[in-house]
């Protein structure tokens, strides 16, 4: 089998790294922000526009695609790349976080998680083996080990039990993947390349459990490592502290993925800490609620003060929305509940996130003597 996945660090600045991942569907320059395309669509944005925005890799959600249209349907259609007509890289999560979110509808055992569908109430079981089978059938380039996401707050004994379970599931995920990785829908046409399975570090809000989880997950051995179990209601300062302590425990020659985080100023901060990959629904979800990120701060576009504002959304942004439309028009669309409001707002927010990451990467490559990393001030985060 030819090399399916590689990662190389090309430049560093302090703990921050600029790198390059190669997957069966192309190159990804890191640090990278990955838009979330939950059900094989980034809400409101067609694939050609995602390409135009410079999206290199996006997420699909295993839980949602498993329920609808179903893994077998996607597999028969050639995998998710063909299904959604996207020839660049894709990452799927394992479904663990979504099942965790169904707290009323799920039951966790050693075998896996039994749950009821939020669509029709039908019963299902996700186990490490079935999560691997689903992710292999969907056919993303990067897939995730099946894990249990610990709720917040959680007692230490509960968190430790959960961490131990996740480690056992990581072993089972790896074994199941190794046995079936040649079954990915595009295996033959991509020169017998397969997917890359990442391990997930858990351990809740306890630094010593995070350390143990990181060390033991690295011992199992994966081509990349994710930090999971954040964005579950904990204070952002706590997240930052735990990430800063955990990153140095991960191999320097493997990509590090922080799952489900965060605001623009946070993704800058985490890139500074040495995180290579991040995803978050925030730019798309906030856009649908009229919250827009700009170089001048956050704007709530429905505010009356924008009703006569002829200026662009962000004078420092070169996206097609800022080049063409006024704040007054964007406010009108949002107030009128027009679908175009969602499309334009999301286009701008994604552009802002992607551009922020490009600037961070460029700053790392140029080195600290020429450019400092972009500083985005926020009352929530102390400078690092």
From Swiss-Prot:
Catalytic activity: 7-aminomethyl-7-carbaguanine + guanosine(34) in tRNA = 7-aminomethyl-7-carbaguanosine(34) in tRNA + guanine
Cofactor: Zn(2+)
Keyword Ribosomal protein (UniProt): no
Region (RNA binding): 260-266, 284-288
Keyword tRNA processing: yes
Functional pathway: tRNA modification; tRNA-queuosine biosynthesis
Keywords: Glycosyltransferase, Metal-binding, Queuosine biosynthesis, Transferase, tRNA processing, Zinc
Annotated Pfam families: TGT
The enzyme's E.C. designation: 2.4.2.29
Positions annotated to bind Zn(2+): 317, 319, 322, 348
One GO term of the biological process aspect: tRNA-guanine transglycosylation
Cofactor binding notes: Binds 1 zinc ion per subunit.
Residue positions of the active site: 93 (proton acceptor), 279 (nucleophile)
Gene Ontology, cellular component aspect: cytosol
Residues that, per the record, bind substrate: 93-97, 147, 202, 229
GO molecular function: metal ion binding; tRNA-guanosine(34) queuine transglycosylase activity
Quaternary data: Homodimer. Within each dimer, one monomer is responsible for RNA recognition and catalysis, while the other monomer binds to the replacement base PreQ1.
Family the UniProt entry places it in: Belongs to the queuine tRNA-ribosyltransferase family.
Function statement: Catalyzes the base-exchange of a guanine (G) residue with the queuine precursor 7-aminomethyl-7-deazaguanine (PreQ1) at position 34 (anticodon wobble position) in tRNAs with GU(N) anticodons (tRNA-Asp, -Asn, -His and -Tyr). Catalysis occurs through a double-displacement mechanism. The nucleophile active site attacks the C1' of nucleotide 34 to detach the guanine base from the RNA, forming a covalent enzyme-RNA intermediate. The proton acceptor active site deprotonates the incoming PreQ1, allowing a nucleophilic attack on the C1' of the ribose to form the product.
Family annotation (HAMAP family): Q_tRNA_Tgt (MF_00168)
Protein name: Queuine tRNA-ribosyltransferase
Organism for this UniProt entry: Koribacter versatilis (strain Ellin345)
